Amino acid sequence: MATSLPTVTHATGRFDYALPAPLRSSGSQLNIYLIDVAQSPLPAGALPAQAWKARLAAALAPKSGSHAAGVLTREFELPGGVPAAWMRLTPSRPDLVTLLALRAVPQAGAAVSMEVEGSAGREPLAEGVFADLAKSWVAGSTQGFSTGTGAFVIQPSQNERASESFAASGIEVSIQTETVEEPDDGESSLQLPQGAHLVLKQHRNVGGFDGVERRVRLADEGAGERLSYLWIFAGKPADGTAPRIRLAATALAPRAGALDETWNTLLSTWRLRPAGAR
């Protein structure tokens, strides 16, 4: 189905896809090798050292509901001059430590942060994984695990999660992928909510992945009827290139045409990115 609106290509984790241009990202959450990662813009003229100091200060600042600031236990550099630090951020759990690092690429106007919390005593192992991950990040790459305009060009791991949401003009879209130990067909997610009417349920191949598509119509209190579309691929065990995939979109019934266009654009353009492992 050809879309009547211009589209924009997006990337979340291991996948590329397109959405109608009006839809804008509401935020993403990314995790690879059990490490939380996030890309942020680096303002023109900003120095990597300045970006690091700001990120470290934000991490150590008291969290909501707490008056205690985090404790910096060691600041150092990973191979390649990537600034990093060990911290204790949970006063009630002195056995927990957090490793934070930030790789900034001024030429690309971007920086990527990496953060993980774990038990004290395994610091050397964590630093080794961080070093490998930091050097694998390539600004502007169209391969690997995407963080936005850059990506970790590294072997897919058995532990990866990626999610992103979009919204515009009453339409909401959510993207979720996660590696699994066993296939999860999301049967609980496919159960009809009370009062919902099943419009369509079918097997549908999306980007080479055989999943289940479901469309329902349900009451939306005070707003009439709402349409909810869902597609799920169960995933393959411990396979970063075939994670569990959950794609969803929703809108009020009067926006059915725009919702259909958005949905078909998403599913018809969904593609696995080249791993590009090196």
How would you describe each model-predicted region?
Residues 2, 13, 18-27, 114-154, ...:
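Surface-exposed amphipathic alpha-helical segments
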Residues 28, 98-113, 275-277:
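Low-complexity, Gly/Pro
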Residues 56-107, 172-239:
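Signature of long, low-cysteine stretches enriched in small and polar/charged residues
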Residues 2-47:
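N-terminal mature-domain "stem" immediately C-terminal to a signal peptide or N-terminal signal-anchor/transmembrane
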Residues 111-212, 223:
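Acidic, serine/threonine- and glycine-rich low-complexity intrinsically disordered segments
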Residues 29-64, 113-117, 161-195, 213, ...:
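A short acidic-to-branched-hydrophobic micro-motif
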Residues 42-46, 93-98, 120-125, 221-227, ...:
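Short, surface-exposed beta-strand/loop "edge" segments at domain boundaries and coil↔beta transitions
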Residues 210-215, 223-227, 238-240, 250-253, ...:
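Acidic, serine/threonine-rich low-complexity disordered tracts
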